[in-house]
Amino acid sequence: MPETRLIDGRDMLPPEPLELALAELGRLAPGDELLLLLHCEPLPLYAILERDGYRYHAVLRADGSHEIRINKP
């Protein structure tokens, strides 16, 4: 059954959220989802996701934080 994993990086300083996200991507099984909550848009992460074939959807939330949902194909 697909699993959703959460990294709430809103209280972390860069590059910690990016490092945690990259480590977690290596653990995702096909169909799993990684949910990131961040105060800034992770532009370097987007390039990595596109290069490696991950699907993602990013939303700017009402509180100004960014919600990024990443799926392993």
Where are these regions (language model features)?
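Sterically constrained small-residue positions within well-ordered secondary structures
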Residues: 27, 47, 59-61
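Short, structured protein-protein interaction patches enriched in aromatics and acidic/basic residues
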Residues: 35-55
